[in-house]
Amino acid sequence: MSDKTNDDKTLSVNPKKTLTLKRPGVEQSTVRQNFSHGRTKAVVVETKKRKFSRPDEKPEVEAAAAPKPAAPAAAPQQAPASAPVSASAAQASAPQPAPVKAPATKAPAAPSAPVTKPHVAQQRPVHQRPGGQQAQRPRPADRSGMVLNTLSRSEMDARRRALEEAQIREVEERARAVEEAKRRAEEDARRAKEHEESARRQAEEEARLKAEAEARRKAEEEAAKRMPQPEARSERRDDARPAPYGARPQQAGRPQGGRPQPAGRPQQGSPRPAPIIADAAPIAGKPLPQSQLRKPGQSDDDDDRRSGAARRGVAAKPEVRAPKVVKGEDDRRRGKLTLTSNLEEEGRSRSLSAMRRRQEKFKRSQMQETREKISREVTIPETITLQELAQRMAERSVDIIKYLMKQGQMMKPGDVIDADTAQLIAEEFGHTVKRVAESDVEEGIFDVADNESAMVSRPPVVTIMGHVDHGKTSLLDAIRHANVVSGEAGGITQHIGAYQVVQNGQKITFIDTPGHAAFTAMRARGAQATDIAILVVAADDSVMPQTIESINHAKAAGVPIIVAINKIDKPAADPQKVRTALLQHEVFVESMGGEVLDVEVSAKNKINLDKLLDAVLLQAEMLDLKADPDRTAEGVVIEAQLDRGRGSVATVLIQKGTLHPGDILVAGSEWGRVRALVNDRGEHVKEAGPAMPVEILGLQGTPQAGDRFAVVANEAKAREIAEYRQRLARDKAVARQSGARGSLEQMMNQLQVSGTKEFPLVIKGDVQGSIEAITNALDKLGTDEVRARIVHSGAGGITESDVSLAEASNAAIIGFNVRANKQARDSAEQQGIEIRYYNIIYDLIDDVKAAMSGLLSPERRETFLGNAEILEVFNITKVGKVAGCRVTEGKVERGAGVRLIRDNVVIHEGKLKTLKRFKDEVAEVPSGQECGMAFENYDDIRAGDVIEAFRVEHVSRTL
């Protein structure tokens, strides 16, 4: 159907094409793809226009099955001429996927260039005919149109995720761009501020230099007025006067959009610097840089060529430098200090303090003032370093070293000098000296004078001494009315006990000792803790070796003795025999015409215990024992141990003053604050007066038995004293170890004094009869060189006191049918004491015999091998002298001992170095054969000498 219009245009409708609506924002074009074997395919290409939206908006979803509108005649899209109508219709009716937002790149509205794929025909525009029909090329019969497959849901999701990630990245990039712009703005502001500060400082520097130049000019004018000179010379000097140094042009700023102007180039409008004369003197107060200093022998040409300095009379060009980064106020003190930066022209200026010191020094030099010498009192210890001495004298260590160099001693500030040298140096420098010693820290601690008006009577301190098993602890148990023995393992005293009893309203302090070893240690440390010694002697056993030792210890300590004759209840008791035996050791009892009190007692039946206590009080009254309870406490350590629950526990005896909880005391090389005071009954007390034994808790370490203690003012003093004593103990230990090696003379003297070697033993058995048998057998093993010494023997198990006694005597412990308790085993393992157990007496005797044999020096046996006569002596290079010998008797072995005999006199004894026969090293040479011999480290051999060969063997000796 067709109609005609007035302008003769025909309106027509194509019956083969469906009327569709045009999708907005979509342009179509068809591309034909060629494949192998002549196959082709038409592909419809849609170009979508991107719709910009905000990030928070959701994409609009178009209808999937919307019909595609027909392309109008005026549309700019392109389609191939051979595209069939059916294909276009099918493509238009196909469902379209929902549009998704494209990336931020804007797509072109229509392709402006042809497709460049190979074998693809050039696209041509579609021309409309007057009748409205589109001109189409005839389609080949074997070609058919195909429609592209739609995207699956997973592909759509992947594409959507990619686009969302791209949007997120876009937002992040936009934020980063904003931050970068902000940072750049701040950096520009900072640089502008730095530039302003640099310009201000440069202006101040120029003003200062200008003022200095003006002042110098005025000074020169004044000097010229005072010293008249010829006019021509004055004019010449005025012409040659250099411009102020450092009057450089101002540093150019950083222009925007242009290249920065060099710092050394003068700006426009600024005054040019005056010419600088090369030979002009540098400005006072600011020396020339090193680059402008002329070296010896350097000419003007070298200056012009190398350093760029101006020739004489010619203005020097200012040096062009690279723009320098100016640091801000915060960065001024940061940066690396190098030689280049330090030697630049604009060097580091002096500080205000340095300028002030320089001005004061200049004024003093002008006025010729001398600084007064301040005399100080210098405290000089036993040793001091030069640096510390200089600090105490307020002198420079360099001056002290110079003085020592003049005296011929090359020393360093860290060298240590003695007190005499330090005193000479201090007096030479005009100071007074106060000599002190390290031991001065202990001054004022002990032996402080007591207040006689405050002296009161104190209880006596009594020590019970005597032989083992004579009843010392049983006697003390009977006096205390407490069963102490039953609480001890095996009935043997394990520790030193200190107790206090009351008799007739008066207190008596008793100290029980397990043997003489502990009392010896206390006496050796100077502990005069005992006022009265009770010598316990068994009436049935009389005087024994340890009884004699106890008598000697008491006499050495200057302690009065009271003899207690114990066990008088036994049938075999003979007290008179005891008194007679004591006469041999200069102990004269009253019944024998002496002054020593004696009391017959029985600890088991508690007989005459009151008489013994009365004798003690009588002796104490004769001694008139007094003490000052109001002064600081002093005393002695009776025993000390490390308790698992309470820490370091020390049993002490207060001798002077009163001890309170909270006091700070020093005991030997240990110190601490008293946390608690416990008496002998286990009760906590508030104070401990003179002659009162207490346990102290709170020490930092465990002191030694016999150490003296004293209360000090503060912890610093206590720590100083403890450190000094620890250092002194270390020095003594080192000296003891170095002296133990000693010289041969000391070793011979020690052998001469000690005499025979002793093998100390502590023997414990099940019954007394076994112990006596073992003791008798060991006594028979002794010789003139070695013998067994029984330190202690007794019936019962091995206790901790036995281990302590063995440790003090360096003895071994032997147990016969007995065992050690756990405390004794732990103590022995800790102290390294060996404990051996035996059940057969013969095994015990054999082991002791073998151990004692080890103390015997081995026997040296010498076996004669043979003689050789030297026939001729050869001097061989790199070997020395070699003796050509003939063996005349026996044989000669390599490595054997030899003696060189000349005129029947032995002149050398040594070993053979080589033994050869016909240039071959041999082990031995028999009699009648010739050989060559060389000695070790000896060459004085002559023809006719006789060489005697022998073998030495060391044979161990047995008892």
Swiss-Prot record:
Polar residues bias: start-end ranges: 27-37
Sites where the protein binds GTP: 466-473, 512-516, 566-569
Superkingdom of origin: Bacteria
UniProt biased composition (Low complexity): 63-118, 128-138, 246-284
Main location: cytoplasm
Compositionally biased residues, Basic and acidic residues: 1-10, 154-225, 232-241, 318-333
Region called G2, residue ranges: 491-495
Stretches the record annotates as G4: 566-569
Domain tr-type G: start-end pairs: 457-626
Family: Belongs to the TRAFAC class translation factor GTPase superfamily. Classic translation factor GTPase family. IF-2 subfamily.
Name of the featured protein: Translation initiation factor IF-2
Species in which this protein is naturally found: Brucella melitensis biotype 1 (strain ATCC 23456 / CCUG 17765 / NCTC 10094 / 16M)
Phylogenetic classification of the source organism: Bacteria, Pseudomonadati, Pseudomonadota, Alphaproteobacteria, Hyphomicrobiales
